[in-house]
């Protein structure tokens, strides 16, 4: 007896009005993740994954392109408002926020969540080049 062909159901995207953009800006790369309020990832993009390699990966323009790609990835969820959490000292901090604003999101809050030790571990020794 032959089985009936299994039809793939079209995946229904849940509609989210408010989201959180997590920006991790290191000296070498920028990672942009947009989540819902509970922290479930809806879409993400990186400067390295956007086609930039080597030292070009750590530029503000690469971070801007990553933010635009992440914004395109989550457009179908219907996000209108974004809360932005920025972590790290990298060059892509400001340009990422500008790109998200230009993509049509209304930025409600910008928070710096860079981890700062209360005199924790000893830092690595200084580089000698």
Curated annotation (Swiss-Prot):
A GO cellular component annotation in the UniProt record:
ribosome
Per the record, the GO terms for biological process are: translation
Keyword Cell membrane found: no
Q: What is this protein called?
A: Small ribosomal subunit protein uS11
Q: Which family does it belong to?
A: Belongs to the universal ribosomal protein uS11 family.
Name the UniProt key words of this record, in alphabetical order.
Answer: Ribonucleoprotein, Ribosomal protein, RNA-binding, rRNA-binding
Self-association state and partner proteins as the record states: Part of the 30S ribosomal subunit. Interacts with proteins S7 and S18. Binds to IF-3.
Q: Which GO terms describe its molecular function?
A: rRNA binding; structural constituent of ribosome
Protein source organism: Salmonella paratyphi B (strain ATCC BAA-1250 / SPB7)
Database matches in Pfam families: Ribosomal_S11
Protein's job: Located on the platform of the 30S subunit, it bridges several disparate RNA helices of the 16S rRNA. Forms part of the Shine-Dalgarno cleft in the 70S ribosome.
Which InterPro entries does its entry note?
Answer: Ribosomal_uS11, Ribosomal_uS11_bac-type, Ribosomal_uS11_CS, Ribosomal_uS11_sf
């Amino acid at each position: 007896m032959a089985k009936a062909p299994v039809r793939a159901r079209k995946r229904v995207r849940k509609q989210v009005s408010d989201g959180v953009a997590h920006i991790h800006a290191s000296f070498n790369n920028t990672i942009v993740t947009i989540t819902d309020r509970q922290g479930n990832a809806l879409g993400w993009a990186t400067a390295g994954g956007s086609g930039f390699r080597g030292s070009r990966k750590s530029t503000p323009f690469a971070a801007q392109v990553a933010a635009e790609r992440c914004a395109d990835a989550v457009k179908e969820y219907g996000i209108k408002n974004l809360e932005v959490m920025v972590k790290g000292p990298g060059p892509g901090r400001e340009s990422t926020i500008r790109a998200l604003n230009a993509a049509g999101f209304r930025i409600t809050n910008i928070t710096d969540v860079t981890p700062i030790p209360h005199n924790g571990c000893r830092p690595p020794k200084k580089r000698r080049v």
